[in-house]
Amino acid sequence: MNKFVSQSTIDTFFDGEHADPFSVLGMHETSNGIEVRVLLPDAEKVFVLSKETKNVLCELLRVDERGFFAGVVPNTHSFFAYQLEVYWGNEAQVIEDPYAFHPMINELDNWLLAEGSHKRPYEILGAHFTECDNVAGVNFRLWAPNAKRVSVVGDFNYWDGRRHPMRFHQSSGIWELFLPKVSLGQLYKFELLDCHNQLRLKADPYAFSSQLRPDTASQIGALPEIVSMTEKRRKANQADQPISIYEVHLGSWRRNLENNFWLDYDQIAEELIPYVKDMGFTHIELLPLSEFPFDGSWGYQPIGLYSPTSRFGTAEGFKRLVNKAHKAGINVILDWVPGHFPSDTHGLVAFDGTALYEHADPKEGYHQDWNTLIYNYGRHEVKNYLASNALYWMERFGLDGIRVDAVASMIYRDYSREDGQWIPNQYGGRENLEAIEFLKQTNHLLGTEIPGVVSIAEESTSFAGVTHPPYEGGLGFHFKWNMGWMNDTLSYMKKDPIYRQHHHSQMTFGMVYQYSENFILPLSHDEVVHGKCSLLGKMPGDAWQKFANLRAYYGYMWGYPGKKLLFMGNEFAQGREWNYQESLDWYLLDEFHGGGWHKAIQDYVRDLNHIYQKNAPLFELDTDPQGFEWLVVDDYQNSVFVFERRSKKDERIIVVSNFTPVLRQNYRFGVNIAGEYLEILNSDAQQYMGSNSTNTSKIVTEDIESHNKAQSISIDIPPLATVYLKLHKVKKVRKMRKTSKVEDTAVKTEKKIAKGKTTRTKKTVADTVSEATEVKPKKTVTKRAVVKKVKNEESAVFPNAEVIAESTSVENNVS
């Protein structure tokens, strides 16, 4: 029996059960004098050195053969700085004693973390490079309030949980240990003795880097430097700006042609950014990049929320990709998944033996559709963990926004559940009040800490006020995916044109609720997987009709109010469904493989985007009813739709769509403004592999009443096509002795335009939200093309979108 520490106490260390290592290990003042006690399994000898003089002060006694050493430092009556000289066989090593260092978490951080109100807990928890008493090392911290013992294990201690048990802060439930001389890139985990005396090996929830699957360790990485938001990036996110989003899965956009392996972040950036810029997209939206164990989840089942996936390289590489996008004038949005997490044992499930991050009751905590677990939003520490993660991605990588996945599954307790499978809220309702409050708090946090960051909801129900400010009962998002519009219009487009007349309202119904929220029109990855066919595959008819239908649909979509989102591959009409394990079918753009069809639709989408960006009527008043008017809404027999878009300066663009394969010659419809109109886009143009039924000359209004308008125009509407007509020149209308109210209104509007006056737009929902936040393949059968590819591009009607946009300036300050 030794005179230093009881054998039973020593046994608890080697049994991995001691909960308070600092009460035993390190330097202690005792009746014997100043004692030093160390736990060094497999060591043979240990000497105490003066840190100042490097002299040996004493040799510690090996009081337990398993590696527990203790001894009294002679002639010493106060604490001093020391090091340990350790002999491992014939090798000697001078080391710092981790148990010689004081606690490093301050009282304020400890209190805020306990309260769950720390804005940036990732700056405290996890693994951080720091200095303590002029010694460099890594400070490890973990929240596990119900664990009996926690140790940090890794490359640096042979993954032995006995060697480095951590200090416990009772008030916050946080465990802490400073380890000197631990270096960047080393692997680590936390070993927990849970409340049921079971050992659990967990990855760090706050790790900045993680191993590539199937390995599961965390990796010591530096906290990325802050990237400031710029005014240019902030402006590009506003509701009155053109927003055309290219949705990308980095693992399958392009792959290495030789081995079908992923490209890294830098290789992707070299190809993706110039492509997106050339195609005219304003934003890139990336499918989730937080580390995830299962490739087939596409990132939507993350475990390492703070770790950019190592599939494509390092966090620094990802940061360079984002920076390259910004230099090209492209904003970057990240899909973010705070709704659920997988049940992999190294993750958050039963973290300390209790349902720490999830609900204990599966009626609340288990997502049966995805076999995942649902976060407990009623727990402050969990909300803090999630909300700060959104801030981390925006602030530390310079991202410009988040798209929150599966919001409906978060805000409804009965989501995808039968009666008896869910628990009502405190008022007996189906709403998840805690999740709703979490979303409000997260949007508020982002808005106050990084004004200008955009927050987008994928919300598939009619929950009211998603993009309204919290003080109006809203969730505080800036935009919401318009799933209703997408489902209705795709349902319409899939029908044979002969039947479309019976479903006319599917293309118009969206306007009934258009201004209830700020909408994004999404043609996302979800629409081209799981047997749903590609977008091209959804279109009816032969090959020519399929492409014509898709071009007409895109034109209708780009003209319709709402920001745009298109999943990769749809810009060139990939024929098969998306496969996350393979690259997109880029070979279709070759003349030999694609016959020019796919290249033509790629050119069309490029022109659409550039025309969209350069014409304010197509985007400026997306959230204001004054920016839109139906001109022909009820011609179901011909499946024709005509509407007008307007800008803040009252510029006008008329969008005309014909969803039958019949040429509508001399089709007359009424317009608001008398004058000359130019055709600036025609999806049936020869260069897009259309039939080339175009309106090449100026289109002049006539004093013929039509559709309750005094003025009208007559044009040829191509088959299965969309046409854009831009007001080019205003014509003065001679006043008759007797005029209708419609004519009076038209004349007044023309006078305003002629004088350069602008319409006064009311405050949009997006403006209000901005203020508030300051606080699833079928084979495509290709038939013989009806129209041959144009060999001589000079004979095409529209050389390119930029020339079109520049050559259609409106006289008299109209454009």
Swiss-Prot record:
Family statement drawn from the similarity comment of this UniProt entry: Belongs to the glycosyl hydrolase 13 family. GlgB subfamily.
Enzyme class: transferase
Subunit structure: Monomer.
Gene Ontology, cellular component aspect: cytosol
NCBIfam families: branching_enzym, PRK05402.1, PRK12313.1
Catalytic activity: Transfers a segment of a (1->4)-alpha-D-glucan chain to a primary hydroxy group in a similar glucan chain
Pfam families in the record: Alpha-amylase, Alpha-amylase_C, CBM_48, GlgB_N
Job description of the protein: Catalyzes the formation of the alpha-1,6-glucosidic linkages in glycogen by scission of a 1,4-alpha-linked oligosaccharide from growing alpha-1,4-glucan chains and the subsequent attachment of the oligosaccharide to the alpha-1,6 position.
Keyword entries, A-Z: Carbohydrate metabolism, Glycogen biosynthesis, Glycogen metabolism, Glycosyltransferase, Transferase
Protein name from the UniProt record: 1,4-alpha-glucan branching enzyme GlgB
One of the GO biological process terms: glycogen biosynthetic process
Record EC number: 2.4.1.18
InterPro entries in the record: A-amylase/branching_C (IPR006048), Branching_enzy (IPR037439), GlgB (IPR006407), GlgB_N (IPR054169), GlgB_N_E_set_prok (IPR044143), Glyco_hydro_13_cat_dom (IPR006047), Glyco_hydro_13_N (IPR004193), Glyco_hydro_b (IPR013780)
Any GO molecular function: hydrolase activity, hydrolyzing O-glycosyl compounds
Active site: D405 (nucleophile), E458 (proton donor)
Gene (UniProt): glgB
Annotated HAMAP family: GlgB (MF_00685)
Organism name: Histophilus somni (strain 2336) (Haemophilus somnus)
Pathway field: Glycan biosynthesis; glycogen biosynthesis
